Amino acid sequence: MSNAPARSPSPVLTGVFAGPIAGLKYQTPTLSGVTSATGEFQYRADEAITFLVGGIVLGAVKAAPRLNLAQLAKRVDGKLDKLLDPSVTNLARFVHTLDQEGDIESGVTIAPIVHELIGDTPINFSPPVMPMGQGGGGDFADDPTLRQILDRLNATPGVFTARTPRTLCSAAASRNELRRNIRGIVKMTDVRIPLRDGSYVCADVFRPAAPGRYPVVMSKGFYGKSFYHDCICNEADVLRKEEMEDRYFSGNPDGAQYENHETVDTSVWVPEGYVCIRVDARGVCKSPGLQAPFSVQEAEDYYDAIEWAGTQPWSNGNVGLWGMSYLAMAQHNVASLQPPHLKAMIAQGTDSDIYNEALYGGGIFGAGFWNWWWKIWSGNNHCGERRETDWMARALATPFNDPTAYGPNGSIFMRPDMSKATAPVWIVGPQVGAIIHQLGSSETYIRSTAAKARKFDFADAWFPDSYSNKSIAEHMRYFDYWLKGIDNGVMDEPPVRVQVRTGNGAHFVLHENDWPIARTQYRRWYFDARPSGWQNDGRRPNMLRIGETMPTEPARAEYDAHLDLGTPTLAPAGSNDGTPRWSTGISFVSEPMSEDLVLAGYMKVGLWVESTSSDMDVFVSLRVLDEQDREIRYESVVLPVDPVHIHPVGHGLLKVSRRKLDVERSTEYWPVHTHLEEDCAPLRSGEIVPIEVGLNPSTALVRKGCRLLVDIQPYAPAGVPVRAYDKSYHVDAVNRIYTGPQHPSYLQLPIIP
């Protein structure tokens, strides 16, 4: 007999089965039981633990504080990249099907009677390993034993309380839930956020599974918060979206850019200790009410959502906003209302004066973009009949910059009072725009002087780069600073970064303290409406001149204002045929550059113009030709707007009757027009008038030997979405441009020494 003292058992520890999964049987060498309502089980250190349903062994694994179903399949061992393995897919589908309510996002609860009903029924989750290319052993849903089990469970009252008769959970849904379990993510779908008027908006909340209080990253949008885009309105939509999500995380054969349009990827952010919330605006998908984009009510709803998120038990009280395009623009509106829990924003591709920067830029309605956006891009953002205000009709009926329609309390679009937008903001501005965001991002940064801190990136491939590993790391550092209180030096860096494009997608970066860049030199090239003699590309005859010396002789060039618009389409390009848009108007070309020029900032032209009609639309494009007289493509991402043609380096427009300048807002580098009805000045016969046209801020390295090419046209140029076309002053009209000492028409460029 041994005299050694008996070893006392090690302490009992508690673990959690992810989901959570409640009612699951477990056994260790010393303990046994059923997982609790929160998925808890007990074990001792270094023990293996076996999980069962009835007498069916699901698998055994070393006990740990947190376990999930993917760890029970030996071939998978919890690895995210192996979830297509049928052994884990079938196992997860079986367990998920047993949930009483049939809502696995809320966890799985297995009724006690299930174990008795299933008993020791043998079931094979893992088909035999087959030689490569010979399949995986058939569909688990066709397994006769599984069918018998489901028939038995469906016939017994109390096993299932909803979604009856129960069918096998889809493979895609089970894998999607497994991914969240592995990453430690809990998803809550269609959470109702109460609003001040007694209504609500629906949100999807993704939070860390581990207990705690976390900062919130919120987006409130117009496109639908379901996976990738649009709504989930019925069971067919549920299955379709589960399949899309599963394919995205299984190699992404569809080429999806993100989990949800213009919001953060929850699979990246939640594991780093953030709650991510996607909110559907009023009238979108299952949020009741009328759709009213960029309205005061929408901003107030956003305020209420922020305050709700900041006071939830899983929130640390700090809410940040992250979004692109629409989801960026909405941020400035709500920031001007100053919700107390809003602590920082990242707005990428934005506008805060929608009339001037997106809707009626230059006084001409952006028909190509807005019709496409409303009918196509946001056309499936509702369940049933679309519920909306008549904002589009009212916008078309209000072509002037009426502050009652487009001001801080605008009845159509809200223009936020930026002096009240005090939350720290990081703005990412694109250098290529579909009539929106290019000017607006830059102007919004300049107007954000009330913000506690501000940063600005002027970028080329802003949209795809927002989801790059580099951008995610930088944005997370920013929110770590403002939402978690981590002093990581992110705000000690120069606040402005400018990507200077060099052609074919390449660029270099300027790190600056100011935007526009303080050392900018504004140089002028003067138009000369005499033939240049340049042997051009053959597309347009009679190229005219532009140079840094004022021409000594007066000259005039004219062109037809009328063109054939062709067959209209809802695409931003506007039509499939008709007059080629590159062929209209007149063009000015420079001599080869004698030195490299770095362009970065705002551009403008000053023109002396006349028309045989009462008005004229002036579209100006700056392009660059290389030493072989080929146009240089500076953008790194070809826009879907007009993929055949190159987006110009600089682009601007003006309806000439809107030429009156707002002298208080205009600067040396950028003309601002009043667009007030009382300032509208139609042209009189024979009248020659001066105008200034701003070209959206941009960048380019123009190398020695390259030429500048400036197109002046009566309609939207190639590579840019179309605008409204008013036949009343285009048909049979002739437009004229004057140059020379009495009419010094010019191009002004921002040169960085």
Question: Would you name each region that the model predicts?
Answer:
Residues E47, S199, Y274, V319, ...:
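Surface-exposed loop/turn positions
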Residues A18, F41-Y43, L195, V609-S613:
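Non-cytosolic beta-sheet module surface loops
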Residues T28-T30, V53, L195, R207, ...:
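Residue-level signal for short segments within beta-strands and strand-turn junctions
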Residues A461-P753:
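C-terminal, loop-rich substrate-recognition/catalytic regions characterized by aromatic stacking residues
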Residues R183-M491, P495:
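Active-site-proximal cap/loop segments of hydrolase catalytic domains
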Residues G23-Q27, A48-F51, W370, I376-G379, ...:
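Short polybasic amphipathic segments
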Residues S2-I182:
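Feature for extracytoplasmic/surface-facing segments of secreted or surface-associated proteins
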Residues I21-K25, D46-A48, Y200, P495, ...:
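Exposed beta-strand and adjacent loop surfaces of beta-rich binding modules
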